[in-house]
Amino acid sequence: MEERMLMFPYILNLLAAMLLGALIGAERQWRQRMAGLRTNALVATGAAVFILSSMTTSPDSPGRIAAQIVSGIGFLGAGVIMREGMNVRGLNTAATLWCSAGIGVLCGLGQFKNALAATIIILCANILLREAAQRINQLPISAEGEKRYILKVTCNKEDESAVRQWLLNIVKEAAICLQGLGSVPAQEQGYKEIRAELVGHADYRKTRELIISRIGDNDNITAIHWSIDSQ
């Protein structure tokens, strides 16, 4: 009977971690992200297990294990971050996993009220701030600081894939933002026109010269056109 009484707080802490982690994961699952309900629940529960085990063996230094959890969860978070061209996906999901580990630490320490409050705040960040971020992304770019440019290059259709990768490397080297990349058949038969939408500083001359000079080194490109987007 005494052993069961000793086990009750342990189980309660783990259940609280699992439930709060699952609550955070439910939002990720609803948005069909890679790390969803089960992953966040397991991360929170695992963090609570480490804290509880450290309190059993070294009750005076649970903070040391918490620090190890913070660094260790980074490897798991890195697994959900993916790069697609110039875009990076999975940062929010990785950050959510990190937060779930924090919830597990609080539950392992028995700080249920703090864990619940943190869970609510994390959910608000993922749900309410999502719309705010989308609205901010739709705001027009300052005309004084940045401008939009259109870069068009013409190449043989067999070389399109290589030229696209060449353009991506040049844009990265020039430290300019790529907003869009597409291609259409050129006026000459057998050729493609690749169109890149760029965003950069209003003083574009140095950037333009760098990009055009680098593109000019590619023998597969037959024509280059640079213009300011008037939209």
Curated annotation (Swiss-Prot):
Residue spans crossing the bilayer: 5-25, 39-59, 62-82, 103-123
Gene knockout outcome: Not required for Mg(2+) influx by MgtB.
Membrane topology: Multi-pass membrane protein
Gene3D superfamilies: 3.30.70.260
Main location, first listed in the record: membrane
Keywords: Cell inner membrane, Cell membrane, Membrane, Transmembrane, Transmembrane helix, Virulence
Keyword check for Transmembrane: yes
Subcellular location: Cell inner membrane
GO annotations of cellular component type: plasma membrane
InterPro entries reported for this sequence: MgtC-like_C (IPR048640), MgtC/SapB/SrpB/YhiD_fam (IPR003416), MgtC_SapB_SrpB_YhiD_N (IPR049177)
The keyword Glycoprotein is assigned to this record: no
Induction description: Part of the mgtC/mgtB operon. Induced by low extracellular levels of Mg(2+). Transcriptionally regulated by extracellular magnesium via the two-component regulatory system PhoQ/PhoP.
Database matches in PANTHER family: PROTEIN MGTC
Function: Virulence factor required for growth in low Mg(2+) medium and for intramacrophage survival. May be involved in regulating membrane potential by activating Na(+)/K(+)-ATPase.
Family: Belongs to the MgtC/SapB family.
NCBIfam families in the cross-refs: PRK15385.1
Name of protein: Protein MgtC
UniProt source species: Salmonella typhimurium (strain LT2 / SGSC1412 / ATCC 700720)
Record lineage: Bacteria, Pseudomonadati, Pseudomonadota, Gammaproteobacteria, Enterobacterales
